[in-house]
Amino acid sequence: MASLFASLGRSLIKLLIVLPVIIGLSISSPAMAAQWDAETLTVPAGSGGQQVTFSESEIKSASKLFKSNCATCHNQGVTKTNQNVGLDLEALSLASPARDNVDGLVEFLKNPMSYDGEYSIADTHPGISSSDVYVQMRTLNDEDLRLIAGYILTAEKVQGDQWGGGKIYF
């Protein structure tokens, strides 16, 4: 019986020593620290070079909006229906018009256009103007769209190549 208590005591002491170290490492990891710095939270506002800086709480709210409204088809920045077009910054910058800024993404969410900007895809892609596709997007207001755009533009900075990277990362 005494050896059982001694064994439990040693295990408890080890746990009390190791647990704070593990918690400390997870809280102070470089990825977590870099996740919310001003550079990460600053993204292009429009095509004219102006910038906008989101707050940490805005991006956290935006993450919830993205997950509840967009992640069904765009989980981790991948487009399920077209693997050639992701939500990574390079793909967004090559769209026409460019969608690598808040204004461009908000406009796309209001009026979805093909990647080359030639025709509307509102009948097949959810958006504020979409007919019967994912009608709950119609409940999003301009601020919600702005936050979702901010989340998309900061996600690659936080997640790296995994954002929009496709199947090789899953």
Swiss-Prot record:
Gene Ontology biological process terms in this record: photosynthesis, light reaction; respiratory electron transport chain
Signal peptide: 1-33
Keyword annotations: Electron transport, Heme, Iron, Membrane, Metal-binding, Photosynthesis, Photosystem II, Signal, Thylakoid, Transport
Principal subcellular localization: membrane
Compartment list: Cellular thylakoid membrane
Binding site for heme c: 70, 73-74, 125
Topology versus the membrane: Peripheral membrane protein
HAMAP family listed in its UniProt record: PSII_Cyt550 (MF_01378)
Function: One of the extrinsic, lumenal subunits of photosystem II (PSII). PSII is a light-driven water plastoquinone oxidoreductase, using light energy to abstract electrons from H(2)O, generating a proton gradient subsequently used for ATP formation. The extrinsic proteins stabilize the structure of photosystem II oxygen-evolving complex (OEC), the ion environment of oxygen evolution and protect the OEC against heat-induced inactivation. Low-potential cytochrome c that plays a role in the OEC of PSII.
Family: Belongs to the cytochrome c family. PsbV subfamily.
UniProt cross-references to NCBIfam families, sorted A to Z: PS_II_C550 (TIGR03045)
Name the record gives this protein: Photosystem II extrinsic protein V
